[in-house]
């Protein structure tokens, strides 16, 4: 079979954008009513919060733990195969939750979904390997908007669908969306993957040894981890924090939802444009600017006096995320040997997922022991460390447009 035919990376970007949008929305669609659904399975009292927390965190934790394994298999068998595998399992598990007889089945299916996930990191690895190097920031920035858009639209749409069709049927609807993503991927995504001969497959250690700059690789993985910590740490207590900023409790949940989603909205609006800027002026420069901007915006959140001020700062914070995510992915694609792209992006996904789990834990722990404002200050310290580390990594490249020059 001829595997050297040039692929249309723009068409692949379009189709994978749709797939990533469906995957992103599938996770967030069920967020508004999942605790109520768990309650309907016979769980009562304080156990509802416990099992809800497990239902939310288990997929991210499981996905992070097995990401390197799926990354290796993607390097062996191709990214498209892994995307189809992930979307099929997500279709079955999300749809299957509609028939869960008790909370243990629900948790088991959520855990299984996490173990077999990987659609988004494999889409990212595929586009990173196919897009021209001078377009990688734009391509990866555009792809990043898919997950963010789905995550933004999901909660509000999920609440409406639950009221119209019932909570169980929403899981069937999500399963149908994921099935559509599977079919689109099978028939319209093309990859000229050349299998590596048996015995020539490089180990993860050998892949890392072939990375052109291991110090920068480690720094990019740390940045990926901290991006999620800064965006997620406030979520466990944001409603309670807002409550301390106002004497009115009218529409408190609605206001909290707007403030939480503000980061995603601005990131969605800016990622593609900022990705182009990274291609033009240097992704490493944009990472430093994004980190400094993130710190300048994040720290004042600890000193706001009204929900409006917090909302504005959260919205501005998204522009930092919009700069960082595509820039990190673009640099990863440039410093990674092509035979190890999937594994390196799998490690990035692992760091992202661990940040999603660590952020709420760190934020809620500091908020519980000290205060909400202290939690925000504490989280901002992670950003300072990242700024210093990134400056050390990039200092000799600041006068260059690319770290590969």
From Swiss-Prot:
GO cellular component, one term: plasma membrane
Places the protein is found: Cell membrane
SS bond list: none
InterPro entries (alphabetical): MFS, MFS_dom, MFS_MdtG_subfamily, MFS_trans_sf, Tet-R_TetA/multi-R_MdtG-like
Keyword terms: Cell membrane, Membrane, Transmembrane, Transmembrane helix, Transport
Residue intervals passing through the bilayer: 13-33, 50-70, 88-108, 111-131, 147-167, 170-190, 216-236, 254-274, 286-306, 308-328, 350-370, 374-394
Main location: membrane
Superkingdom of origin organism: Bacteria
A molecular-function term among this protein's GO annotations: transmembrane transporter activity
Membrane topology listed for this record: Multi-pass membrane protein
Main function: Efflux pump for various substrates.
Homology family: Belongs to the major facilitator superfamily. TCR/Tet family.
Protein name (record): Multi-drug resistance efflux pump PmrA homolog
Organism: Lactococcus lactis subsp. lactis (strain IL1403) (Streptococcus lactis)
Gene: pmrA
């Amino acid at each position: 079979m001829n595997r050297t035919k040039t692929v249309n990376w723009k068409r692949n970007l379009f189709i994978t954008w749709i797939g990533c949008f469906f995957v992103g929305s599938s996770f967030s669609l069920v967020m508004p009513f999942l605790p109520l659904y768990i309650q309907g399975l016979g769980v009562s009292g304080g156990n509802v919060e416990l099992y809800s927390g497990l239902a939310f965190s288990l997929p991210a934790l499981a996905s992070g733990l097995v990401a390197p394994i799926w990354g290796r298999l993607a390097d062996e068998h191709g990214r498209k195969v892994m995307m189809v595998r992930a979307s099929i399992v997500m279709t079955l598990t999300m749809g299957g939750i509609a028939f869960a007889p008790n909370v243990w089945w629900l948790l088991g299916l959520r855990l299984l979904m996490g173990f077999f996930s990987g659609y988004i990191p494999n889409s990212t690895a595929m586009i990173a390997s196919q897009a021209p190097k001078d377009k990688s920031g734009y391509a990866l920035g555009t792809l990043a908007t898919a997950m963010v858009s789905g995550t933004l639209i999901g909660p509000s749409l999920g609440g409406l669908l639950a009221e119209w069709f019932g909570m169980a049927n929403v899981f069937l609807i999500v399963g149908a969306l994921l099935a559509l993503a599977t079919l689109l991927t099978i028939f319209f995504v093309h990859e000229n993957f050349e299998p590596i001969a048996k015995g020539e497959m490089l180990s993860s250690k050998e892949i890392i040894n072939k990375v052109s700059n291991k110090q920068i690789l480690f720094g990019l993985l740390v940045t990926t981890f901290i991006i999620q910590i800064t965006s997620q740490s406030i979520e466990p207590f944001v409603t309670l924090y807002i409550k301390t900023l106002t004497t009115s409790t009218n529409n408190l949940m609605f206001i909290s939802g707007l403030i939480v989603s503000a980061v995603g909205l601005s990131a969605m609006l800016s990622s593609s444009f900022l990705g182009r800027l990274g291609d033009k002026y240097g992704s490493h420069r944009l990472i430093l600017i994004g980190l400094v901007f993130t710190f300048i915006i994040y720290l004042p959140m600890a000193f706001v006096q009204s929900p409006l001020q917090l909302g504005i700062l959260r919205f501005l914070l998204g522009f930092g995320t919009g700069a960082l995510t595509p820039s990190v992915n673009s640099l990863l694609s440039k410093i990674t040997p092509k035979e190890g792209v999937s594994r390196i992006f799998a490690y990035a996904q692992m760091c992202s997922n661990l940040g999603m789990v660590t952020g709420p834990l760190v934020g809620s722990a500091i908020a519980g022991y000290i205060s909400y404002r202290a939690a925000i200050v504490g989280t901002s310290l992670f950003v300072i460390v990242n700024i210093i580390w990134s400056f050390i990594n990039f200092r000799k490249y600041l006068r260059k447009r690319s770290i590969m020059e």
